[in-house]
Curated annotation (Swiss-Prot):
Main subcellular location: membrane
Similarity comment: Belongs to the interleukin-1 receptor family.
Organism, scientific name: Rattus norvegicus (Rat)
Extracellular topological domain: 27-331
Taxonomic classification: Eukaryota, Metazoa, Chordata, Craniata, Vertebrata
Full protein name: Interleukin-1 receptor-like 1
């Protein structure tokens, strides 16, 4: 009896003494930017109906509740208005209720604002995964603040613009979302406390989930009805590749021989190797299967090979056949290489010969193909001779030019080659208007032959002839110019470009001159000399036979006749 009585007393004592349970929750983290508002909530529940005390763990000081302080307690919330870097530390909240004591701690870190507007990863809130069906981004922690609309949104530190972006309450909606919308989004709003406004920003990443799709198989290699050439005894490797889309699905790429899978065909020298899965440039799933035939035989050419690709959309096959490849005839290859080398050498030699003897070849071709050509250009003369008739020199110099113009040129070009020349003083009748006749004769000539000599004096008549001839050749493009330079028998005086008109100087620099020097020409009337070859090359094709054609008839068919043969 005494023992039972004692046990009852102990039970009564236990029931009359209040019981307290202490509940502690792990430490959480929170962060903010300097000079912005930061509000954190006690990690423990029950603070809304029970008193909450906050302590700064670094100093074990209790944080006041008076709102006039920069940091104060409001129920279960701790407010930093605004936050400073030195506020960083561990804060502990204590919730007291009749049944228990709950404690929680927060590791608060206040950062300086990044100078380059790039938010580091440790200051980012949870990432939002978007899609075409869900393109909503929520501004984090906004529910803790006393905020008013609107909320401003930024992407990668740039304000969002355009009709695709819609801000509603604490959400951002993006229409027609795609991969270009991925990035870091920052919401910016205003918190109001005791009539004072504080700025709050929060950043989180947004990614777009790729929506997969599947398509009917597309074989990218080999082409349909592809033919592979292979030599007997060699190894043939043929790849079968196909793409199916981007979604996860059942796919297969394989080879068949006579509609039978390689594994069931029963020949060890014919194997199928699966290649690695690959993705194309547009993200599609592609598979490859390699058919390897070791030691190709004659029977392999009669088999039917199929590259097969399949998924739930269907099956597609590309037939492939083998064809015998003739072995390379190395002897024939040597002959071809040697022939091409000889041909190349011949072409090079021919080019060099033509470059060296081009004038001779051109004259020969002209004499053979077009010895006399009827020209319907309305021209009366083949060439008009322009020469200086007054000199600052001796009479001997004047006589040599006059003799060359009136005797040497006509004797060779008219008598031997059949050209018709117009020479001032020979073909112009007395009593005619010299200026009119000169201009008309130049206009009716196919070539303008300038005879240039040292110490030329620009007489009125000579200057006028030059002006008309150069205008016809350079401006009207009505004729061509031949420049003959009379070189003296010595080095004392040569042709000076400064004595010529500007247009004539330009022609001399562009096309050069044909030089005549009596002491360098063994036979002054020989058509085989370098001088007369160059003159004939620049002259047009004669339209009439030479005056001595009757004498030269028994000879070769050359147009220009060389009197040294008679």
């Amino acid at each position: 009896m005494i023992g039972k009585w004692r046990m009852g007393l102990w039970a009564l004592a236990i029931l009359t003494v209040p019981m307290y349970f202490i509940v502690t929750e792990g430490r959480k983290t929170s962060w903010g930017l300097e000079n912005e508002a930061l509000i954190v909530r006690c990690p423990q529940r029950g603070g809304a109906i029970n008193p909450v005390e906050w302590y700064y763990s670094n100093t074990n000081e209790r944080i006041p509740t008076q709102k006039r302080n920069r940091i104060f307690v409001s129920r279960d919330r701790l407010k930093f208005l605004p936050a400073k870097v030195e506020d960083s530390g561990i804060y502990t909240c204590v919730i007291r209720s009749p049944e228990s004591i709950k404690t929680g701690s927060l590791n608060v870190t206040i950062y300086k604002r990044p100078p380059n507007c790039k938010i580091p990863d440790y200051m980012m809130y949870s990432t939002v995964d978007g899609s075409d069906k869900n393109s909503k981004i929520t501004c984090p922690t906004i529910a803790l603040y006393n905020w008013t609309a609107p909320v401003q949104w930024f992407k990668n530190c740039k304000a969002l613009q355009g009709p695709r972006f819609r801000a509603h309450m604490s959400y951002l909606f993006i229409d027609k979302v795609s991969h270009v919308d991925e990035g870091d989004y920052t919401c910016r709003f205003t918190h109001t406390e005791n009539g004072t406004n504080y700025i709050v920003t929060a950043t989180r990443s947004f990614t777009v989930e790729e929506k997969g799709f599947s398509t009917f198989p597309v074989i990218t290699n080999p082409p349909h009805n592809y033919t592979v050439e292979v030599e007997i005894g060699k190894t043939a490797n043929i790849a079968c590749s196909a793409c199916f889309g981007t979604a996860s699905q059942f796919v297969a790429v394989l080879w068949q021989i006579n509609k039978t899978r390689i594994g069931s065909f029963g020949k060890a020298r014919i194997q199928e190797e699966k290649g690695p899965n690959k993705s194309s440039s547009n993200g599609m799933i592609c598979l490859t299967s390699l058919l390897r035939i070791t030691g190709v035989t004659d029977k392999d050419f009669s088999l039917k090979y199929d590259c097969v690709a399949m998924n739930h959309h269907g099956v597609i096959r590309h037939p492939v056949r083998l064809r015998r490849k003739q072995p390379i005839d190395h002897q024939s290859t040597y002959y071809i290489v040697a022939g091409c080398s000889l041909l190349l050498m011949f072409i090079n030699v021919l080019v060099i010969v033509l470059k060296v003897f081009w004038i001779e070849v051109a004259l020969f071709w002209r004499d053979i193909m077009a010895p006399y050509k009827t020209q319907n250009d309305g021209k009366l003369y083949d060439a008009y001779i322009i020469y200086p008739r007054v000199f600052r020199g001796s009479a001997a110099g004047t006589g040599s030019v006059e003799y060359f113009v009136h005797y040497t040129l006509p004797d060779v070009l008219e008598n031997k080659c059949g050209y018709k020349l117009c020479i001032y003083g020979r073909d112009l009748l007395p009593g005619q208007d010299a200026a009119t006749v000169v201009e008309s004769s130049i206009q009716n000539s196919r070539r303008q032959v300038f005879v240039l000599a040292p110490h030329m004096m620009h007489s009125k008549e000579f200057a006028y002839e030059q002006e008309i001839a150069l205008h016809s050749a350079l401006i009207q493009n009505n004729s061509k110019v031949i420049l003959i330079e009379m070189e003296p028998m010595g080095e004392a005086s040569r042709l000076q470009l400064g004595d010529l008109q500007d247009s004539l100087q330009h022609l001399v620099k562009m096309q050069g001159t044909i030089k005549w020097r009596e002491d360098h020409v063994a036979d002054k009337q020989s058509l085989s000399s370098k001088f007369w070859k160059h003159v004939r090359y620049q002259m047009p094709v004669p339209k009439r036979p030479p005056k001595m054609a009757s004498v030269a008839a028994p000879l070769s068919g050359k147009v220009c006749l060389d009197l040294k043969h008679f």
